[in-house]
Amino acid sequence: MPLETPILLLQSYTEMKQFEVLSKKAQSLLERYPSQPHFYYYAGLGYNQLQQFKKAKDVLETGIDYVIENPVLEANFYIQLGETFNGLGDMAKKDFFFSKANQLVKEKK
């Protein structure tokens, strides 16, 4: 199965705000494809939306290491990490990750 198919499925769960399904499906996919950063991203996004910030932190911090030459995905990881640390009450790390995301967005323009 091409990886675009499950990524589109995860995007549709996100758009429909089905975050419980999103996080479970993404977690299942990343166990089968452990080097695919998109699955970590979507799992983290789902966990953030469900306010499961510790799970989001773990999956996002692992997944960011698999992002290679994809500044958009990297910026999205940093945004989700910022949301995670905001939820965990760590404002210094929240600001750090939002700043990194902002820097990547500026470089892309």
Give the location of each predicted region:
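Start-of-helix register in tetratricopeptide repeats
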Residues: 4, 37-38, 72, 76
